[in-house]
């Protein structure tokens, strides 16, 4: 049974008061161009993916924005379709406690009692839930709608859409159009970014039938990059394997049987261990065990992979990106438009949901203050808070990636000892687990 089906049911089942939206059209006379219809809206969200849809739902479910008109633009021509009979998607995310907090603001009647470190959910399932919930507020993405350009007017931004005769006049434009954000480019917002010269390979894995309950995520740090196996059900897991550019083509060209063999070898084989560091690690471990008694632990083995779902193998380049500004007058960036992180810690979409939570809280305060919610004063507050948090996380994950990418023996021994130390001391392990599961 799929993870977080309760989340899907609860998001759809809760009833809120809804309001109707009716476009108001005016005639715009700008220069020699013929008059064009201009639809007046309060908030325009460009990008109907996970973060953009969550942003729209945050506004729709907020009592303070009940009378505001929200428009959600989506450049794609169709929305994801979810069916229990469909194979698992290869695009999943690990929702952390803060992201679950955000979903609970959409469903206050059914708070989650889950204290897991994370919940592994298919992206399509999350987006389908969000869009289904938006329908109850009479908000649906406008498909095939991409921002061609925009310009500032006295009290609004006028947006011209590709292949549409109607312009939008909006009080606030929120860019959620991905890491290659065209809106960010149009606004000439510079970025800090670099290429990791790595690829992430994803696939949906089929597990052996005799495996115990598949509720643990596995990650192994190899000299070539981390490999992770994320549980979906007792029969399936999701693969995220970071490899150098020079290696990804070889793996992508293997047959399914050969690829499965490489995955199992990557999780279990000693071929990836550096022999020079094993003896150092063992000596240090035996020394601390004499000083501090540790409780015996049962060694767990990663699941045995027997196959992959057909056509689920895919690869994408890995980069780090952070916009130098998240806010401009009447314009904000959220999600991958603002930042992109290495996938080794599964923080990408969680950071985007963190943007949503931060922005809605700040704009709600603006409404309470009786101020213009699109005022740069409030938008800069969002930028300040999120830049501080996101940049710290980007750089910490980047540092971890570099730490686990080195083959320098003393560093390899030190990190191995550190992980072993945490694993063998239950109190320390519980402390880190509690911090990771914290919803604050």
Regions found by a protein language model. Give the residues of each.
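Conserved FAD-binding catalytic core of PHBH/FMO-like flavoproteins
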Residues: 164-165, 173-298, 310-313, 327
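Short FAD-binding loop at a beta-strand-to-alpha-helix junction that anchors the flavin cofactor
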Residues: 325-343
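Conserved N-terminal helical subregion
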Residues: 35-40, 105-186, 192-204
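Glycine-rich FAD pyrophosphate-binding loop
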Residues: 44-46, 58-89
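C-terminal helical "tail/cap" subdomain of flavin- and related membrane-associated enzymes
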Residues: 297-301, 361-440
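Beta1/beta-strand and adjacent pyrophosphate-binding region of the FAD-binding site
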Residues: 33-51, 71
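N-terminal mitochondrial targeting presequence
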Residues: 1-39
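N-terminal FAD cofactor-binding segment of flavoenzymes
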Residues: 83-105
């Amino acid at each position: 049974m799929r993870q977080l089906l309760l989340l899907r049911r609860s998001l759809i089942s809760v009833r809120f008061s809804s309001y109707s939206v009716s476009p108001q059209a005016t005639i715009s006379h700008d220069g020699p161009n013929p008059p064009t219809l201009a639809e007046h809206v309060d908030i325009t969200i460009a990008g109907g993916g996970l973060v953009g849809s969550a942003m729209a739902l945050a506004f729709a479910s907020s009592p303070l924005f009940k009378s505001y008109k929200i428009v959600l633009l989506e450049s794609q021509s169709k929305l994801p379709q979810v069916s229990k009979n469909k194979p698992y998607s290869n695009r999943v995310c690990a929702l952390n406690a803060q992201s679950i907090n955000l979903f609970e603001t959409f469903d206050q009647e059914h708070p989650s009692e889950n204290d897991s470190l994370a919940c592994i959910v298919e992206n399509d399932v999350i987006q389908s839930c969000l869009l289904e919930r938006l329908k109850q507020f009479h908000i649906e993405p406008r498909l095939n709608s991409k921002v061609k350009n925009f310009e500032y007017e006295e009290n609004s931004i006028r947006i011209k859409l590709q292949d549409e005769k109607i312009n939008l006049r909006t009080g606030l434009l929120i860019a959620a159009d991905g890491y290659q954000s065209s809106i960010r480019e149009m606004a000439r917002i510079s970025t800090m970014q670099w290429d990791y010269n790595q690829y992430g390979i994803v696939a949906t894995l089929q597990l052996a039938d005799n495996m115990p309950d598949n509720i643990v995520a596995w990650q192994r740090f190899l000299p070539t990059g981390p490999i992770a196996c994320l549980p979906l059900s007792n029969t399936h897991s999701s693969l995220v394997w970071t490899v150098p550019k020079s290696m990804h083509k070889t793996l992508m060209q293997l047959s399914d049987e050969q690829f499965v063999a490489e995955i199992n070898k990557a999780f279990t084989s000693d071929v990836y261990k550096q022999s020079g560091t094993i003896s150092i690690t063992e000596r240090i471990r035996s020394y601390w065990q004499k000083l501090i008694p540790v409780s015996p632990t049962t060694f767990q083995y990663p699941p045995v992979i027997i196959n992959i779902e057909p056509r689920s193998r895919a690869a994408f380049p890995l980069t780090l990106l952070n916009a130098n500004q998240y806010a401009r007058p009447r314009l904000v960036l959220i999600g991958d438009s603002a930042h992109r992180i290495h996938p080794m810690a599964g923080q990408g979409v969680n950071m985007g949901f963190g943007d949503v939570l931060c922005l809605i809280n700040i704009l709600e305060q603006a409404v309470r203050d009786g101020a213009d919610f699109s005022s740069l004063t409030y938008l800069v507050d969002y930028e300040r808070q999120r830049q501080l948090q996101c940049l710290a996380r980007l750089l910490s994950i980047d540092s971890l990636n570099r730490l686990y990418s080195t083959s320098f023996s003393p560093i390899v021994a030190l990190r191995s000892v550190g992980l072993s130390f945490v694993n063998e001391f239950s109190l320390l392990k519980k402390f880190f687990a509690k911090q990771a599961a914290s919803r604050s």
